[in-house]
UniProtKB/Swiss-Prot annotation:
Zn(2+) binds at H566, H570, C668, H672. Consists of three domains; the N-terminal catalytic domain, the editing domain and the C-terminal C-Ala domain. The editing domain removes incorrectly charged amino acids, while the C-Ala domain, along with tRNA(Ala), serves as a bridge to cooperatively bring together the editing and aminoacylation centers thus stimulating deacylation of misacylated tRNAs. Pfam families: DHHA1, tRNA-synt_2c, tRNA_SAD. This is Alanine--tRNA ligase.
Amino acid sequence: MKFMKTNDLREAYLKFFESKDHLRMDSFSLVPKNDKSLLLINAGMAPLKPYFTGLQEPPKRRITTCQKCIRTGDIENVGITSRHGTFFEMLGNFSFADYFKKEIIPWAWEFITEVLELPKDRLYVTIYLDDDEAYEYWTTLTDVDKTHIFRLGKEDNFWEHGAGPCGPCTEIHFNRSEEIPTNADEFVKLADEDKIIEFWNLVFTQFDGDGKGNYEKLANTNIDTGMGLERLATIMQEKNSIFEIDTLENILSEVAKLANVKYGENQKTDISLRLITDHIRSITFMISDDVMPSNEGRGYVLRRLLRRAARHGKTLGIKEAFLCNLCDTVIRDSSEAYPELNSKKEYIKKVIKIEEDKFRETLDSGMEILNGFISELKAKNEKVLSGVDGFKLYDTFGFPMELTKEILEDEGLSLDEDAFHEEMKVQRERARSARKVSNYMGTDVKTLDIIPAEVETVFDGYDNDTLNAEVKVLIEGEDFTDAITEGNKAIIVTDVTPLYAEMGGQIGDTGVIFNDGFKANVLDTKKNIGGKIVHFVEVVSGELKVGDTVTIEVDKVRRENIKKNHTATHLLDKALTEVLGSHVHQAGSYVSNDRLRFDFSHFEAMTEEEINKVEDLVNEAITSVTPVVTEVMDLQEAKNSGAIGIFDDKYADKVRVVSAGEYSKELCGGTHIDNTGKIGLFKIISESGIAAGTRRIEAVIGKEAYKIVNEKKDLLKEISTKLKCSEKELLAKLDQQVKELKEKDKEITALKSKFASMGIDDIVSSSRNVKDINVISYELKDVDSDTLRDVCEKVRDKAPNSIVLLMSANAGKVIICAMATKDAVAKGAHCGKLIKEISSMLGGGGGGRPDMAQAGGKMPEKIQEAIEESYKIVETLAK
C-alpha cells in the first residue's frame, strides 16, 4: 500500500480540493470568534458556522481547510488508550449552497482511490437507512463494491444537534482485518472491535429539524465533510495507533530519550509517554494562538494540560523542566503548515518554561501535603479525601482538581467532588455576578443580526467626513419599521456612510444624520455579525422613512482625536517590541477619543526604566514628524513587506497597510492621522497585569498628556513645600525620612519582643494537662511573626513535656505558631495536625512537622474559640 507522511497527506488533500475550485483557507485560531458556545474550536466546521447559518457571506461558495482542533471531553483516557488525544487536525471541504451529493461522493472516491491509492477491496461505505439518493450516486458514479455499502440508522448516519439544519451523512471506512462483513450487523461488530475504522464523514445538510422529529427541506443545501488527519495517517502508514505515525512518533521518541525508557516495554511508562506526546501538541498550538495559562476558561484547560504533562514527566524520572524544549519537535514538524509556530517559537517556549517552573516549585510542596493527606486516610482506613482538603490544594498550591483526583486514584482513593465544588461556590458566584451578559458586540438588539443579505452597506469615510446616503433599513426596539419619529432611539442602516464602525479596538464614530425634515444624533456606529454597518441614533426632530435620502456627518473633532490615538497605538506596539523583545504580541486594544489601551503578551511587570524607554521611543517617533501612509495591497504582499497584524483574523484578499515611515508598519482598517507630529505628547499612565502572561498599558496623548505632566509637577511642588526643601533636595530628604522610620520600627519591634518576653512566666502558668501533655494555648496582643516564633520557642524551652500554641491578631489577620518538646511528640502531640485544624477554624490554612508548624488565618474574632478547641484536638491526638 502507498506510504504517505502526515504533512504530505495534508497538502495532498488541500491541493485536490483546490483543483475542484475550492478556496484553500488557513486554519482558524483555536480561540473561537464571536461564538460563546465554544471554549476552543473542536471541529473543522466550527469556525464556519456563520457561513452555514447565513449570518455571514463566505468568501467563496467552496472552501477547504485543515483546521487545528482541541477536544478535552475524553482527557482521562489520553495516554491510557492508544487512540485518544486532545489535539488533532481536521481536513474538511465545504459547500455553501453550491454542490451537493452528486459531486462530493465521486470526488471523495477519486481522492481516496486515485490520490491516496487505497485498495478498493478494503473500503466500505455506510449511508443513512432511507438515503436512496446517496446509494444511487455511490453505485452509479463510483466503482465501490455494492456489497461494501451498508445502511445504518439515525444514531450512526444522521447528523443533527437539537433544532436547526441537519441531514443524513455517509461515512467511509477502512477494513484493517481479513474478516469480510456480509451484513450491517457484522459490519458494526467489526467496527466496534476497531477492525474497521471510519476515517471520513460526509454530511449532507438538507433539512431543517424542529428537534421533535419533524423535518422540512432546506431551500439551500450544504456540504460539511470531516476527516481526521492523524487517523488517516495511521491507515496510510499502516500503524495501529496515532502515537506511531511519523509526527507523533518523533515527539514520543524524544520524551522516551529524555526519560531513558523504551516505548512498549512498560504499561505505566507508556501511558506517560503517550500523554506527554499528545499534551505538548495542544500546549504548543494553544499558546501560539495566544491562550495563556490561568485559572479559568481556556487558560485553565491549557494550565491543566501543561501540569498533567509536567507531572507525568516527573513520574518518568525527568528531573528538569523539559516541555519548553520538547515543543521544538512539534514546531519543527508542523511549522510548514502553521508558520505562526516558527514566528512565535521563543514566545511559546518562554510561556511554557515560566508555567512549568512555577508548577515544579509548587508540585513538591503540594505533593508533600497531599501525601500527608493520603497517609492519614490510609491510617484511618478511609477512602475519600475531603473536599475542604482538596480545595486547599487547589487554592494554595494551584493543584487542579483533576490532578488531585488522578494522584488519589493511583493510590486507590477518591476525592469528595461535591464538597470541593461547594468550597468553590463562593468564588464562582462572585465571578458570575461580575460577568455581564450581552448579545453580539455588546448590544441588546437581536434584530440587527438578521438584516437581509441583499442590503449592502459601505464605509467611505477615510477621505470623507460628510456623505449623502439612502436609508435601507430602520429598526426600533426589536422590530423592523418603515419609519422612526422624534424622541425615539433607533437603528439606521444606509447604503453608504462616512462613520467608522467599531472594529479592531477602535470605537465607533458619532455624528449626525439629517435632511430637511429630520435630524438624529448618532450615539454609536457598529457592525452586526454579518458585517453590516448600523448607526445607533436618538431622533431629535422630524420623521424618517425607509428610502429617504439623508446627509451623514461625522463629529470631526472626536474623529481627529481617535485618529491620533490610533496612530499612537501603532507606535506603542513597535516600541514595546523594541524594548521588551519579539515575543510581544498584541492581545487586544481600545482606541477612543480621549485615551488608548493596549494589551500585549509579556511575562512580568515592566520596570520603570522599560516604561520610560517605551515612552521615549514613541515620543521620538512623534517629534520626527513622520508621514503616515496608507496603502492597499494583496495580503501576501503585505506579509512579505514586513507588516504585522493579527493574522488569525480572516483578512480579505486586499488589505490596508498603515506605515509611519520605516518605524511602524501594520495591517489596519482603522482611521489614522497623516503625520505623527499631530499626536503631540505621549504619556503612559499605567502598566498592569490583566491575566497570566498578559500586560496592559493605558496612555494619553496631546492635551491629556500635558495635563498629567502638569498635575505631577504641582504634586511635586506640594510635597517639597510640606517637607520644607527644594524639589532637587526631595530624594535626599525622603531617604533620610525612610531611614529614620526604619530605625524607629526596629526600636518598636524590640520593645514589643521585650514586652512579650516579660510575660513568659504568665504564659507557662496558663498550661493545662491533657493526657499527660502540658498544653499551652495563648493569645499575644499585636506582635509580628518573628516575635511570636521567638516567644513560642522560649515558652517551649521553659515548659517540659509541652505543646505550645500561640496566636496573635495583626492588621485584621491572624498569625499562628506551634512548637512541641520531644517527649510531648512521643506521647502523640503533633503541631502540624493541631495547626491544620486551628487555622481552618480561623479561615486560613497551613501545616508542618510534629515538632513545629506555622499558619495564618483571617478571623481574629475566633481566637478564643480556637484556644478552647486546641485542648480537645490535643486530647484526640494523645496516645
